[in-house]
Each structure stands twice: as C-alpha cells, then as structure tokens.
Regions:
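Intrinsically disordered, low-complexity terminal regions
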Residues: 1-62, 71, 77, 84-127
Length: 127
C-alpha cells in the first residue's frame, strides 16, 4: 500500500461534469472523468480499458461507482468499487461499502460503510 509510482493517477480528463451540471441517470465513461457537479445514477467504466474517475470537493454522486482508478474528495452515496486503486482525499464522504485492491485514505476522509478488500483473486462481480 506504499507504492506511489504504481498507483499514479492519470491526469488526462476526457469528460467533465461541470459544477452547475446535474445528470439524472447512469453514466458510462472511458478514459478520464472529472465530476464537479451532481450525478443521480450509477457511474461506471464503459469498457475493459482502465479508466479514472475524479470526484472534486464539490462533486456529488448518488449511485454505485465503479472504475479502475478513483480519486474522491466529494460525496458519494452508494457502493464504490475500484479494480485497481482508490484515493480518498480529506473532504471525501462515502455512505456505502467500499471495494478496493489498494486504498489511500487522507486524514479527514469519512466512510460510513464496510471496507471490503478484493485482493488479487477476488471475483469481478464482488460488488
């Protein structure tokens, strides 16, 4: 869990949900997604290519979240599942279970739910 180089987050953003944007319904993405607004629905990778989700301090997702790499500094109400790496920054608030292989949690981040380690041999449909 001390592998900074292996867990480096790709800074490339292909899709931006702006601060004044609200999406009702599921969102499927590929590449990099940054959420500054609100999403009421599930957010997941579109295909098998590893993708990155960044939820900013003012961003909010009400629904399940699934991506290879996830950085959260906002609020999620729902299960969060990462097939590779999750970083919870200081203002992260998660109400729901967190499924992870590698987790970095900053001081101040809050999880109201279970932490479930997926490990290397965990089934893909664990969440």
């Amino acid at each position: 869990m001390f592998f900074k180089k292996a867990n480096k987050i790709d800074n490339r953003i292909d899709t931006l949900v702006g601060a004044d944007t609200r999406i009702e319904g599921d969102l499927h993405f590929s590449g990099g997604l940054r959420v500054d607004g609100a999403i009421h629905g599930d957010v997941s990778e579109q295909n098998s290519n590893p993708s990155t989700l960044i939820l900013s301090e003012h961003g909010r997702i009400e629904g399940a979240v699934s991506a290879a790499k996830i950085v959260i500094n906002g609020k999620v109400i729902g299960a969060v599942k990462s097939s590779h790496f999750i970083e919870l920054q200081s203002k992260a608030r998660i109400t729901g279970d967190l499924y992870y292989k590698s987790l970095e949690m900053h001081t101040g981040a809050v999880i109201e739910g279970k932490l479930v380690y997926l490990g290397d041999n965990a089934p893909e449909d664990a969440a």
